[in-house]
């Protein structure tokens, strides 16, 4: 449905409606949130200031080869229409070129704009199929973008693990940790408290569009606290800014919009 609640069936028009809706989700939710009553900086763990500085480092050809081997060929192609299978099949000849591009990006703290374009496919979750809010946006990125992202994420994770920045209670987005481990930890705590005749209370939260509502300014300030260098912060700022997307319905594409 459009803004006047009129049902639209033209694929091009539908793609435009979806794109406008998806690109404004984070902003609309953030504006609806009440202003914080406390300064977020008071929650920082001050001992973390003792660890060394973090900066992205250059990578070798073998690292590119290993990443290409790990990519699934079942993933759809992104905006650049470069299939992952083509990269994997030619990994030994393409790895030096890709390593050069990645290292140039790291040296200049620039994430290329063409790698920040997402092709979005709406996936119906449940409920009224004419209501945009009942769809989940599936963003399909460039295969080369995924390679660069994996490299950056691996370096950040390694730094956080080595310097024990992650709380031991975090199980998501960490190697050798999963939901099973989180449940086991919970059950262990419950068992210990039960045997000690203690009362246990739990709070379970499901944040709506959590990643879409992250305040990038606060994120960068947290990186400053964790001793990220100016170059590394500039790189992440570049990665987060000027991201564009278009929605594809059948074979009709919307215009490009910048994520807010």
Which residues are covered by each model-predicted region?
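Conserved pre-motif C helix in the palm subdomain of viral-like polymerases
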Residues: 26, 133-162, 181, 208-211
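Alpha-helical recognition domains of nuclear gene-regulatory proteins
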Residues: 21, 67-70, 85-86, 101-104, ...
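Surface-exposed loop/turn segments and immediately adjacent short secondary-structure elements
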Residues: 1-134, 139, 143-147, 166, ...
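Conserved polymerase palm-domain catalytic core
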Residues: 207-260
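Electropositive, glycine- and tryptophan-enriched low-complexity nucleic-acid-binding patches
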Residues: 150, 157-173, 255-256
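Conserved short loop/turn motifs at secondary-structure junctions
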Residues: 81-90, 170-175, 204-210
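Conserved catalytic palm subdomain of right-hand nucleotidyl-transferase polymerases, strongest
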Residues: 74-82, 120, 131-140, 181-224
